[in-house]
Amino acid sequence: MSSSGFNLSRSRWLLVAVLALSMACERSQPPAPPPPPPVVAKASTPAPEPEDPIFPEAPPPPPPAPPAPPPEPPKATGDLAAIRGGGTLRVLVEGTDEDFLPRQGMPKAQDRALLERFAEKQGLAVEFIQAPAFDQLIPMLREGRGDLIAADLTVTPARAKEIAFTRPLRVVSEFVVGKRGAAELPRKPEQLAGRTVHVRESNSFVDSLRELAQGKASGLVIAPVPESTETEEIVYQVSRGELPLTVADSHLLTAIEAYNPDVERLFPIAEGRQIAWAVRQENPGLKLALDSFITEHVLTEYASERFTGDLAAIRKRGVLRVLTRNNPITYFLHRGEQYGFDFELARAAAEEMGVRLEIVVPPSRDLLIPWLNEGRGDVIAASLTVTPERSAEVAFSRPYLFVEEVLVQRASGPKLASLAELKGQKIHVRASSSYHSTLLALQKTHGPFEIVQEPEDLETEALLDRVAEGEIPFTVADSHLLTAEQSYRDGLEAAFPLPVEGAPASKEGSRGIAFAVRKDATKLRGFLDGFVKKMYRGTLYNMWRKRYFENSRRVTEAKVERVEVSGTLSPYDSIFQSYSSRYGMDWRLMAAQAYQESRFNPKLKSWVGAIGLFQVMPATGRQLGFRKLEDPDEGTHAGVMYMQQLVNRFEPGIPFKHRLRFALASYNAGYGHVQDARRIAREKGWNPDKWFGHVEKAMLLLERPQYYRRARYGYCRGSEPVKYVSEIQNRYVSYVDLIPH
């Protein structure tokens, strides 16, 4: 059955059967309708959608007298002493609650990390408040709705009349940006004459463009874009050919170029522009504290991208650059938060070192060691196996994980049971992987067999997926990677472990995984050895190991879904009805979502720390004003309010039912990943405003490196939101069948 094609007549027939059977049961046992049919995480084909008539076409009408929404946070304009009294530093930021996947030098990620350190030094909590549009940042600051602005604000004389700028965080150039390969691109400022450049009116770029329009580029047209549109989105539209030209700061452009190869920086129109934070002019104490912090922590950072210093130099710069890979074990983005086993260890190491963490993601795995030795990073933390070949190029720390290398086969395919059966087989691996070295050694004793070299940008998880789908017969994986993958899917099994020359490194496995540093970074290596010795098998380490390798994230169906004859879906129906009515949602849809999230267990806590009936992340709950998410009332209020916010983030011109599905997918995987999928859908010629058969297909592509490497938010296990939306859709149809109103 298609994930979008739930058969209503079949559902009604099953319901009648269940009700008939219930007459023979004890009255104390409520009849249980069968759960919705299992959903295979594959995109449905674009076709007329039979579920559309039953899915909400528009928000339900509001109640006659809706309860008042939660009050706005109180405004406050006090200086640092008053802020300390309140205990929270309120930071105004631009745009979404999710940043790019921080690959290298992301401005938002840098600012967030610095401000968290500043707040900690001042004994404060930090709260990031999103402005609805860029031109609202300064008014919100002056009104007391935040204490400072951290939004890549350029220092200009006009702005300095309204607000006080801190010391500059960075100095940038403003570059004209075009679509790579487009015809007749301008190559110097004079060639902007008669051209159209799209920017926000409140942006400092407008001043630079007006100066050109009045001089060497007469006839230049400055076309405004909505203030709620972020610069990255404008650059993306230019790279797609939807807009001709725009302008971006050099540091942001560098970050965008890391994943969007269709962007071309043409020439600067302004240089030496200062970027700073901003506070109210009547808050000199806060400004002084920020200036002192910036001098200490920002001005001592590295001056170039290449740096090969040891531990003392890293501490002086205040930043540890960690080379890693974007995949579902090492480092990834989920619901706007950064996760990954190697990432957690690297972050803890940076904290112990007393520096800020910066993530650097090379385009392919075989570049990790070259980039390290070139000085583009300080440490590799990417599940890198210790091998003699690699040890000739880098120095490894004490291992932080021990694994076996196992031959992986399809559970329902041809089976191998021993090394003797390798002869004549095809095994697919990357040439740069430790698996390749292991197989080469086995060729001498158990060959011949064919080693098929796969592209270097292909992660092991992608090869496991190809084995499960029957596209390739065998691959090799570390045992912990296979275990993690099996928590998501069936169809994969380990044939047998592959022997490695020499004695086992540990009773836990024959291969060690460790940090890698440059050979001359002896002090850094010593620090990491001590860090691993202290951390290994400790409380935090064991928690991360369980989270990423041992915790099954598949949704269990062991608990039978029940709906009582009285028409009750759950013990919390009245709460669902109350808040759904307040926020214009169908309570049965919210009940279906709550079941999907928690099986109606308000005390449930997920592997990433989400809590309550709607599994709201604590950070999201705090932003919405909720702290007791395990309370059914507060947890439901937070979940339904957040769903309404997600629905409203999508363009109002999109039919409500499609915005609902996008919101559900965003709730599960993150708004940013859904926007990435919509971009891919548009590029593929699919409908970016429709979920089933269109954006859901694009969502699955975010598991493939040729797509997620170019995605703003990076890798996403797209099968999860595809399954999530379809199962809630099907459950909602069942609930509507049972409770028509």
Locate predicted features.
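A ligand-binding cleft/hinge motif common to bilobed small-molecule-binding domains
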Residues: D135, A150-E162, S208-G215, Y236-E271, ...
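Extended ligand-binding regions for polar small-molecule ligands
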Residues: P48-P74, A81, A109-K121, R180-V206, ...
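Periplasmic-binding protein-like
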Residues: G95-T96, A158, R167-A183, E227, ...
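Bilobed "Venus flytrap"/periplasmic-binding protein-like clamshell domains
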Residues: R90-D99, R103-E120, T154, S173-E230, ...
